[in-house]
Amino acid sequence: MSEYASSIHSQMKQFDTKYSGNRILQQLENKTNLPKSYLVAGLGFAYLLLIFINVGGVGEILSNFAGFVLPAYLSLVALKTPTSTDDTQLLTYWIVFSFLSVIEFWSKAILYLIPFYWFLKTVFLIYIALPQTGGARMIYQKIVAPLTDRYILRDVSKTEKDEIRASVNEASKATGASVH
């Protein structure tokens, strides 16, 4: 247990060091006499608690906001990078996010069947949004690819698929354009 606590303490110290130049967090730290990491963790906990309790039905908008902000930022950053290493992660995320948005048309029925749906959705979206967890890669490999591969290039043999992929990758390297 002490390993776990020391790991969290170390990460919080790293957070405080990394954001020591942030003016807003510095002002909050000066006013409250609490480290930046405690403030951010407390605000994150309060945010998740509001989603969990779903007072006045705000859980839906807070969940969607949390599920949009970080992936949107990462997507904008990915558009500026020449490599396509992060594209599968982000595209998988947006596929799952869109699928959940379509399902939520029946949100009253979902909330009846799954009482803490917005909280569970938020935790799940954060899990697949963070590249460190590998959640989107796992979802892609276990669910998305097996369901969609049979419809994409379904009339093409494996050899032809490999040739197509190789020529696309070759063209990508020659032109410097990224392949998605």
Swiss-Prot record:
GO biological process: endoplasmic reticulum inheritance; endoplasmic reticulum organization; endoplasmic reticulum tubular network organization; ER-dependent peroxisome organization; nuclear pore complex assembly; response to endoplasmic reticulum stress; vacuole organization; vesicle-mediated transport
Positions on the Cytoplasmic side per record topology: 2-35, 79-88, 128-180
Disruption phenotype: Cells have more than three vacuoles with a grape-like assembly.
Ranges where the record places region Interaction with YIP1: 2-17
Membrane topology according to the record: Multi-pass membrane protein
Annotated positions of the N-acetylserine modification: S2
Entry keyword set: Acetylation, Endoplasmic reticulum, Golgi apparatus, Membrane, Transmembrane, Transmembrane helix
Miscellaneous comment: Present with 1759 molecules/cell in log phase SD medium.
Identification of the protein by name: Protein YOP1
Organism encoding this protein: Saccharomyces cerevisiae (strain ATCC 204508 / S288c) (Baker's yeast)
Lineage, opening ranks: Eukaryota, Fungi, Dikarya, Ascomycota, Saccharomycotina
Underlying gene: YOP1
